Amino acid sequence: MRLATFNILHGRTVADDLVIPERLRQAVQDLDADVLALQEVDRDQPRSHLADLTAVAADAMGAVSSQFVAAISGTPGATWMAATGRESPGTASYGIALLSRYPVLDWQVLRLPRIPAKFPMWLRVPRKIIVVHEEPRAVVVGRFDTPTGPLVVANTHLSFVPGWNRLQLQRIRRYLRVFDEPVVLMGDLNMAGRAPAELTGFTPLATHPTFPLAEPTEQLDHILLRGSLGPVVSSDAPLMPLSDHRALVVDLA
């Protein structure tokens, strides 16, 4: 079984600032994951040519189960509101997606608490402080029928605000307690090193720096396990043709 997580930067390539869905398709084919967690996923956004990037990825990997969960309704960086899951078809949205080559038994969605007020954020380029609203955050959880039995997989993209992302991760840990099956938590947790494993009590399946893309120095993207699966055969953080993150991949026996 191959697990992978990838923050796709809404399909954008940093080098040329272009969103070309075919690049995402090729990247997903190259990852060749059985279960794939994606973050920063666009649907019906003008900046990504109104493409459904979840559908592009699902077709590329041959997924039989996929679920997109919008965190934002509208356009990130412009006019938006927190998504509710009741948006009309065709509404521009942005969020996370979970895809699998295994049949899904059920889906669940958890909306995470967000900072209720605006807060200052330092931009390295240009060097200035701006006041922003924190983006809404969500978790998509799938329970899949795998050859070794039911497997629960959760995908999320946590806040970049130190401390707040820890509270969100603790909320996820409590939410996942109800499952008796092995649980995999994947995603861009915006926390480096062993902090996510220490906060959750989960086992890290891969330890590779994933950010920034060219010469990564921090592991912001994680694949964590509670319970027992097959042993890890290999893991990697491959350079992909898009995004500002590397993907994170784990192969299990």
PLM-predicted stretches and their roles:
Residues 104-109, 143-146, 161-170, 174-184, ...:
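Metal-dependent phosphoester-hydrolase catalytic domains
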Residues 82-88, 126-131, 208-212, 235-239:
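Short, P/G- and charge-enriched loop/turn segments at secondary-structure junctions
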Residues 78-81, 119-128, 204-207, 231-233:
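Short Pro/Gly-enriched beta-strand edge/turn motifs at strand-loop
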Residues 7-8, 41, 156-158, 187-190, ...:
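Active-site metal-binding loops of divalent metal-dependent hydrolases
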Residues 100-147:
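Active-site catalytic loop in hydrolytic enzyme cores
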Residues 10-14, 42, 114-131, 155-162:
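Surface-exposed cleft-lining segments at the edges of enzyme active sites
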Residues 1-96, 151, 166-171, 191:
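N-terminal, active-site-proximal structural segment of metallo-dependent hydrolase catalytic domains
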Residues 5, 96-98, 139-143, 155, ...:
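Conserved hydrophobic/aromatic beta-strand scaffold that supports enzyme active sites
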